[in-house]
Amino acid sequence: MGELGTMGGTRDFLPDEMIRREYVIDTLKTIFRKYGFEPLETPAIERWETLAGKYGEEGEKLIYHVVSSGSLGTLKAGERTEHALRYDLTVPLARVVGMYGDQMVADPADPKKQTRRLPRPFKRYQIQPVWRGDRPGEGRYREFHQCDADVVGSTSPLVETELIALTVEAFKALGFADFTVKINHRQLLKGLIEQAGIAPTKEATVLTSIDKLDKLPPEKVRLELAGKGLNADQLDALFQVIALEGTSEQVLEGARSLLAGSEAAQRGIGELTKLLHYLEALGVDSAYYRIDLALARGLDYYTGTIFETVSAAKVGSVGAGGRYDRLIYDLSGGKADLPACGTSFGLDRILAAMDQLGLFASLRRAGEVLVLHFGDPGVSQVCFELVRGLREAGVRAELGYHEEPFTPNGMRQQLGYANEKGFAYAVIVGPDEMAQGQAALRDLTTRRQEKIPLATAGQLIAGRLRS
């Protein structure tokens, strides 16, 4: 048998890591549901025809193909398989909307009536792994989770408003204090490029360079753009707008004046102005979002508002999203022509940021209380009753697995386990405690121990944990 290990670019998540991951995922799910999003799950394996042509030539090379055992010996070199592992969650969403978007079912409230199986707008969240045959490296994996929330079927800027509000609430719930949702608009950027006299064919490559301004100084980005054929006047026109500073309203007012000759830019500015008004009306704290005209989001399928969340931690973007009104049509093969807008949370980067910022310090492992168990007559039954009562009170309680009569060594072994697992309290009921009608309650953080009445031990411990 060879050395034990995992495939490159994949990971095991041991209990201490899983507790953190589940904490983040559960927090996101709670926020998603609070905003009316419903869960969706799709198969890991998709038909190749569903994925083909959706990710460009380079992206397609990274798709994992699935070979059935019956065709192992019949596939020729370069021949495609019929199935592949999903590459992202957006294409499966488009397939689902194309398959079920117009499907009618009986209305649960009135079986005589028909209603759409997928409400319109369709608000879904999806948290599942995806696979890419990338070269493994720092922060780059072949298997990783995406956490997406999308709204399909509405052009209203209220969609962007709620997604940004949701994003702010989610990061605050996770304990982040210093983070910013940067906001821009693809039509504003299109108008900027247009008014600067840059050919439309260069739009994608120019935006790719502009998007590096959060990592590189402006001079380096200017040099890169000059290398792509932009002259001094074009560069000045770009950076005059990109460099605008002040409040979000002041930045938009400056852009409105500088880009007065562009219909596309004015349309984008108008939508962003409305978005700011809605965010304020919804009570979203403006300390957590701002207009940033250097935000470009390299993906060319965005058509309207775009946004990206950055934190004080040095991990890069921890979330991003935007409006993509043509993508569902393209990805569904023309079966569904619906506007859409969504956001995605970077689970691995969020975990890295929270670890860096010490936001997991108060997060304990699965157990809260360990009831030490001893096999003395009568003691064992009391331990059973105590652990059952704690669980009924909603406390995460474990029973020690020591079956011998009370000994100091047996107590040390069980307390060692409690410390390893990070319990808050240990409850000790030995023959002496039994005789006194008491239990010894040990605080495993402070190491202090006290005697409490055995009859009310469960309620007392539950109360302390919930206070």
Curated annotation (Swiss-Prot):
Major localization class: cytoplasm
Recorded superkingdom: Bacteria
MF (Gene Ontology): ATP binding; histidine-tRNA ligase activity
Ranges in a coiled coil: none
HAMAP family tied to this protein: His_tRNA_synth
Catalysis performed (reactions): tRNA(His) + L-histidine + ATP = L-histidyl-tRNA(His) + AMP + diphosphate + H(+)
Organism: Gloeobacter violaceus (strain ATCC 29082 / PCC 7421)
Pfam families in the cross-refs: HGTP_anticodon (PF03129), tRNA-synt_His (PF13393)
Family of the protein in this entry: Belongs to the class-II aminoacyl-tRNA synthetase family.
Enzyme class at the top of the EC tree: ligase
Keywords (A to Z) from UniProt: Aminoacyl-tRNA synthetase, ATP-binding, Cytoplasm, Ligase, Nucleotide-binding, Protein biosynthesis
A GO cellular component entry from the record: cytoplasm
Subunit structure: Homodimer.
Keyword Manganese in record: no
Subcellular location: Cytoplasm
InterPro entries listed in its UniProt record: aa-tRNA-synth_II, aa-tRNA-synth_II/BPL/LPL, Anticodon-bd, Anticodon-bd_dom_sf, His-tRNA-ligase, HisRS-like_core, HisRS/HisZ
PROSITE patterns: AA_TRNA_LIGASE_II
Protein name: Histidine--tRNA ligase
GO biological process: histidyl-tRNA aminoacylation
EC number from the UniProt entry: 6.1.1.21
